[in-house]
Amino acid sequence: MISWFDFFWLLTYFLVLIGLAGYGFHRLMMVVLYVKHRKNVPQPKGQWEEWPMVTVQLPMFNEKYVVEGLLRKVTAIDYPKDKLEIQILDDSTDDTYELCQQQVEFYKQQGFDIKCLHRVDRTGYKAGALEAADMVAKGEFLLILDADFRPEPDILKVTMPYFTDEKVALVQTRWGHLNREKNMLTKLQSIFLDGHFALEQTVRNRSDRFFTFNGTAGVWRKCAIFDGGGWEHDTITEDMDLSYRVQMKGWNFVYLNDYVTPAELPEDMDGFKAQQHRWTKGCIQVCRKMLTTIWKAKIPLKAKLEATTHLTCNYSYLALVLLCVLIMPVCTGMVQPSEEWAWTELRMIVLTLTLFFFATLTVCGFYIAAEMIVKPRRWWRIFYLILPLLALGVGMAVNNAKAVLEGAFGKSCEFVRTPKFGESKEGQKSIEKRSQGYKAIKSILVPVLELCFGGFFLAIEITFLMCALNFNADSFGALWQFIFLLPFLGFFYTGLSSLCRIVEGMRSRSAKKA
């Protein structure tokens, strides 16, 4: 007779697997829908007889390393000067403001309508800065660019014709990656982002589902922002929040997968974790705020279902952590499944195949498909990155699960910006020096938990290895050993990377005090 502990363990385990399998199935659906809608490329309704007024908004906070490069690119945009306004939305507390003022004076002398809107109070963070700037912006349309983006000269000539359709509220371009080849972390991030942009955003737009503004590299119709209720401060992903509100008002969005606006990726684990934490927590905040409203809205069922999947997908990180915890009783012998439950067949059919296929192969297929879209002639070069990609995805589970819990239970936090280092002629030493100007992650809890999980899976790997050496491994041993290798590598990578940064920060602070 199975014990109550075993019963609840099995029930929870299967529910977690079903949840993860559901999100894995959604990835497969994205690939299928892309094939179905790949030819539905959006086309502009017409051309402007006279170019409309556009305001370029550049929100920044302590971005002194990238502001000059950004303004060089913005002032090189091919658009009539008398139809272009540039707003630097600066909330900086360092010497970025003085640098911005120098740049404003320089470009004013060249005939640009440029100004720096400086706030001492960071109320609402980026959303607050955009809200204040919209009130004084001259343009009917707003091109928003984060400080690390480098727009091409034709960005407005390409995007503006789509606004000849009066129902279009937003034109979003695809993110590119300036430092894709910098290190292993940037290579893996670029693949993650390519999956989101090349597949998810493209499919959502071309199949008449809702997609969201990515916070930058897009052009808004200003009146649509006001119609949707404007920028609100109650989430840290104000772009996602506004996107759903505007689309539920009946406005249309356009996503240009073939037009790329390049940007800088975080080059260290601290920056990557901070960015992922903000995106994950913000998505859960929007889920709490908007999901009920979305289901009450008079929009197609497929749009409601896709929005639900989009807003809840980050709960998979919590499920992944729970799965790692649930594995422990089996590996330590606390759960001893009985023969009555036909454990061998269940493990083969449900546990092994489901976990391996939906949590591994679907992810592989999803990102390979994305790279085939982004780099059709060189996509095969990412094969050696697939296993590190899977490992990093698992390794980020603790960091992102923490963000899910904070978002779900309403914990507020500071808007932590992503480190941006810009181009440096002095090489890596200069980058390391610049990184000291950004806050390191001080909390040791997440990296310690990551290392604990990594140590547990290391012990499992050693056990499997010993069994194999003694010829005691069963027929599934090799597959389980491969599956458990991913969390072992992922948790150690994320945990050690963060711990090293924390130690460096402690040493730096000690040296300053001395």
Where are these regions (language model features)?
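N-terminal signal-anchor transmembrane helix
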Residues: M29-K83
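Membrane-embedded multi-pass helical conduit in multi-pass membrane proteins
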Residues: Y34-K36, P44-W48, C313-E414, V446-A514
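Loop-to-transmembrane boundary segments
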Residues: V66, K296-L320, E423-L458
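Acidic donor-binding segment of Leloir-type glycosyltransferases
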Residues: R72-H118, R122
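The conserved acidic donor/metal-binding loop of glycosyltransferases
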Residues: S92, D146-R150, D234
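Long helical/loop segments within the catalytic core of UDP-sugar-dependent glycosyltransferases
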Residues: V104-F141, P153-I236, Q247-M248, M269-T312
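Catalytic donor-sugar/metal-binding loop of nucleotide-sugar-dependent glycosyltransferases
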Residues: D234, S243-P262
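Juxtamembrane inter-helical linkers in multi-pass membrane proteins
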Residues: Y384, K411-R434
